Amino acid sequence: MSSYSSNIDRLQREIARLKADDSREMSKEKQAQSKAHKAQQAISSAKSLSTQKSKMSELERATRDGAAIGKKRADIAKKIADKAKQLSSYQAKQFKADEQAVKKVAQEQKRLSDERTKHEAFIKQSLSSMRTTASATMEAEEEYDFFISHASEDKEAFVQDLVAALRDLGAKIFYDAYTLKVGDSLRRKIDQGLANSKFGIVVLSEHFFSKQWPARELDGLTAMEIGGQTRILPIWHKVSYDEVRRFSPSLADKVALNTSLKSVEEIAKELHSLI
């Protein structure tokens, strides 16, 4: 709770308590006035001097009590007025703070919307660029079942064994160690591989998250998936859901294979079953 809200709650409670005090004092004041009125009437109708003196004393006491109560009620009224002024000030500040918070949320939503629009434009541009590159080349283009996007540090630990298992099952793989030849343009061959693969396997690992080139391949695969030309198949390699989500929330929501739960052969069979 903000300091404004806590002060508003406190002042509202204090004002309510003071009003309750004033209500009790008002009842006492009415009683004192009633006593004074009765004493006044008794004095007028008294037949003896002693009765008059007694009723006069009652009138004086009731008058003093009424005056004291009136002074107390005036003090309470002043306190209520002071606290009402403070309450109004805090309420105005709270209203201004709420307005600023709403404005900040709206600005953040606009920023996220602008970022999403820019990212979508980038993906569309990437898709257009890949199509142009694929159209401009005169080389015979080979089609692949799988394009494997990975960090070089994961080759020996996992990727090489996965490629071998898939090839043993008869799958055609775009894998840089097998597909690229001396003198090839790396970017052109990667774009061709992306454009001519049915599925894009993305090996998500700590190494993958820290590399620029795999991230560029992932953008290309995302563009192809949006265009309906391929599907991204994520494999989690020694990473958690939170780590994947920090890198890409959309990838974290995809059904993924996990090297911690399945062997290389089991993963290869599941992937091959999609062809």
UniProtKB/Swiss-Prot annotation:
EC number(s) on file: 3.2.2.-, 3.2.2.6
Show the ranges annotated as biased composition (Low complexity).
Answer: 39-48
Q: Name one GO molecular function term.
A: lipid binding
Classification via SUPFAM superfamilies: Toll/Interleukin receptor TIR domain (SSF52200)
Q: Which UniProt keywords apply?
A: Host cell membrane, Host membrane, Hydrolase, Lipid-binding, Membrane, NAD, Secreted, Virulence
Query: Which GO CC annotations does the UniProt entry carry?
Result: extracellular region; host cell plasma membrane; membrane
Q: What does the entry give for GO biological process?
A: NAD catabolic process; signal transduction
Does the record bear Hydrolase in its keywords? Answer: yes
Principal localization? secreted
Q: Which domain of life is it from?
A: Bacteria
Catalysed reaction, written as an equation: NAD(+) + H2O = ADP-D-ribose + nicotinamide + H(+); NAD(+) = 2'cADPR + nicotinamide + H(+)
- UniProt lists compositionally biased (Basic and acidic residues) regions at 17-32, 55-64
| UniProt-recorded name of the protein | Probable 2' cyclic ADP-D-ribose synthase TcpB
Coding gene? tcpB
